[in-house]
UniProtKB/Swiss-Prot annotation:
SUPFAM superfamilies in the record: ARM repeat (SSF48371)
Miscellaneous notes: Present with 3260 molecules/cell in log phase SD medium.
PROSITE patterns the record matches: MI (PS51366)
Gene: CWC22
Source organism: Saccharomyces cerevisiae (strain ATCC 204508 / S288c) (Baker's yeast)
Full protein name: Pre-mRNA-splicing factor CWC22
GO CC terms of this entry: catalytic step 2 spliceosome; cytoplasm; Prp19 complex; U2-type spliceosomal complex
Residue numbers spanned by region Disordered: 505-577
Amino acid sequence: MSTATIQDEDIKFQRENWEMIRSHVSPIISNLTMDNLQESHRDLFQVNILIGRNIICKNVVDFTLNKQNGRLIPALSALIALLNSDIPDIGETLAKELMLMFVQQFNRKDYVSCGNILQCLSILFLYDVIHEIVILQILLLLLEKNSLRLVIAVMKICGWKLALVSKKTHDMIWEKLRYILQTQELSSTLRESLETLFEIRQKDYKSGSQGLFILDPTSYTVHTHSYIVSDEDEANKELGNFEKCENFNELTMAFDTLRQKLLINNTSDTNEGSNSQLQIYDMTSTNDVEFKKKIYLVLKSSLSGDEAAHKLLKLKIANNLKKSVVDIIIKSSLQESTFSKFYSILSERMITFHRSWQTAYNETFEQNYTQDIEDYETDQLRILGKFWGHLISYEFLPMDCLKIIKLTEEESCPQGRIFIKFLFQELVNELGLDELQLRLNSSKLDGMFPLEGDAEHIRYSINFFTAIGLGLLTEDMRSRLTIIQEVEDAEEEEKKLREEEELEKLRKKARESQPTQGPKIHESRLFLQKDTRENSRSRSPFTVETRKRARSRTPPRGSRNHRNRSRTPPARRQRHR
């Protein structure tokens, strides 16, 4: 058989295979819904989609351009993310083709098709299939052309993720939108849509990713693709058409290996509950260091919190080691100069994956506050407070975990009080005072917000929260303290009255006993005075003689009539006269 004949037979065989793949793939994608997503993903692997990857890309683009499929775009995006995990070429091709198709439809002013494509690209950005540079190119183009409706649609879906990975550009876009809202004359509908978007941002995009399919991190590998549009690039019009495959046999062997791997994974997932075995780790000092080093390298090599969570969960860490992993995550976050939401998003994914991770985070929080708090510096306390405040505000950790804190001068240290300050400031920033007050009322945090017991404890707590600018949280304590003080004042007044009554009784007893003792005392005094007078009168002769002898020896004076009383000689006196 000649070479030309062999080549013709080969092309014929490949064409028949291509037709079979196309007839199998097209109905699966055209009938795709969120309910049959996983089943559709499995069905695609019944044919060699390594050879037919362009067929899948063509069907995805056509599905997106169909104006009636707007509500099914989330399911399509999830399917692309699953396929990209196994075959990254599909994600790379679709990132380019969807971007070029958007530019083409935008120039044609087909805004419905543009909306579908943007929805798909935005969700793929959330799944880390495409890089943020793709979304930023689109947003800058839309702002330049003043296509505000499409900008609003994109920001509603992926604005929260854009704020995490490219904060400066995110803020620049918002400043541009604020300027447009304040300076330009807009229709009432468009103005209302913009105001709604600003309200969503104020709530930190809490409803941004609702309704999306949650990918299993243990079986999902992240491959992120970027593409920069140039003026010369155009969408591939031949996408999905038959082309001879030069490496047909190699792709066939590679697909068999891939399908076998997927079958093994599915079988292990199915039998995991019945055939699971306890994983044993040798945690000697050497292996402990290696284990921590491995976790640390996973964190530092990840571009996003979602990617880090996927890598960590893929390790299938035993329950007794999860607390160590959480401790490494927190220590890594404290090495940053400021608080990074990378670690909070990572923690969100870990906690929601299994309740054993929530237990590990609860135990680590208790250890941070009760044992390690005095070892942290002020900047680290700020990061630590924001980290735990974020998890508590979004209810990944319950408010009851704060029950271990008792806010008194004796049972709290300065570092602990600084930590509480930053934690509550983060709670207020995330929830607002009103929502925080409602949550505190539903949780009995007697250690920080006491309503019973010692008045000094209540007073200290009031003074603390007032000093950090959260005095509104202390209204119940203030009312309770007023009641306690009134009760204490009444008890003190009653005590004084009892003391005065006792003192009055003692005085009364003293007055009653005074008349019986008074005359005896008086008579005894008279007796002593009389005895003293008699003793002074009845002196003995010996005493009189003694007194006479004791008189002065000065010569006796003469009579008062004697003229010469002076001792001056008479003659001298006469001369003087």
